[in-house]
């Protein structure tokens, strides 16, 4: 069955491509030369570690990892426990409060519980230099994450893609809308949230789609690992 395929099965070949090896080498060289790179090396591929290919139900595309200390840990929009909730995620919580009955905004921005339920929180670029947004945008990560999206498109069916902002929407242009459910809105950033992110109802619509397919909806209330045991 297609959904038994793992990331390792479908990405092993891609990870041997010269461009990908060059990307890893460039990042490793920068780290070795003393440049602070986020997220830490062990966290770069967490999106794939927490959400296996066969478990993907929803894809949320981010752009660049957070470039402040302690924020990025490999999941788009998410920050580690104890780190202030960034503005875009705060706006996501506001949309959830306004649309999901009983949702109360948590005091943290750690979204591992979403990832464990099948929400792939994928940044299109997987590393960044400290304090320098988009500093790794041309290293080859975009080619890799394009491949990831095309593999989900090819090997899975009925995945909900939440594409917020023009960058994500361009990135998602290859998705087959006959096989998958694509929802578009402005980015939740304070610069654009009022242009249609608020009121987009994407979290509700995603769950409705999953339920129609007989799948378990996402519990959008983020819980810290200790709370969920």
Curated annotation (Swiss-Prot):
InterPro entries: UDG_fam1, Ura-DNA_Glyclase_AS, Uracil-DNA_glycosylase-like, Uracil-DNA_glycosylase-like_sf. It holds the Pfam family UDG. Disulfide bonds: none annotated. The active site is at residue 64. GO terms for molecular function: uracil DNA N-glycosylase activity. One of its GO terms (cellular component) is cytoplasm. The keyword Cytoplasm applies. It is found in: Cytoplasm. The keyword Hydrolase applies. Its EC number is 3.2.2.27. Keywords: Cytoplasm, DNA damage, DNA repair, Hydrolase. It catalyses: Hydrolyzes single-stranded DNA or mismatched double-stranded DNA and polynucleotides, releasing free uracil. One of its GO terms (biological process) is base-excision repair, AP site formation via deaminated base removal. Excises uracil residues from the DNA which can arise as a result of misincorporation of dUMP residues by DNA polymerase or due to deamination of cytosine. Belongs to the uracil-DNA glycosylase (UDG) superfamily. UNG family. Monomer. This is Uracil-DNA glycosylase. It comes from Escherichia coli (strain K12). The lineage of its organism: Bacteria, Pseudomonadati, Pseudomonadota, Gammaproteobacteria, Enterobacterales. The gene is ung.
């Amino acid at each position: 069955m297609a959904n038994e395929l793992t990331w390792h099965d479908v990405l092993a070949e891609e990870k041997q491509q010269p461009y990908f090896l060059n990307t890893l080498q460039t990042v490793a060289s920068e780290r070795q030369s003393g440049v602070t790179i986020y997220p830490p090396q062990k966290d770069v591929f967490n999106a794939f570690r927490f959400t296996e290919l066969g478990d993907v139900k929803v894809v949320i595309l981010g752009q660049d990892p957070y470039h402040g200390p302690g924020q990025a840990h490999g999941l788009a929009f998410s920050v580690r426990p104890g780190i202030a909730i960034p503005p875009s995620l705060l706006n996501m919580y506001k949309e959830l409060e306004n649309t999901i009955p009983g949702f109360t905004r948590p005091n943290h921005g750690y979204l591992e519980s979403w990832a464990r339920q099948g929400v792939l929180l994928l940044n299109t670029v997987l590393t960044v230099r400290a304090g320098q947004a988009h500093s790794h945008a041309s290293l080859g990560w975009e080619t890799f994450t394009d491949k990831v999206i095309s593999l989900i498109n090819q090997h899975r069916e009925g995945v909900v893609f939440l594409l917020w902002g023009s960058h994500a929407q361009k990135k998602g242009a290859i998705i087959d809308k006959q096989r998958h459910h694509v929802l578009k809105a402005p980015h939740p950033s304070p610069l654009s949230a009022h242009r249609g992110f608020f009121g987009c109802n994407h979290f509700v619509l995603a769950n409705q789609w999953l339920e129609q397919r007989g799948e378990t909806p996402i519990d959008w209330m983020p819980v810290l690992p200790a709370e969920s045991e």
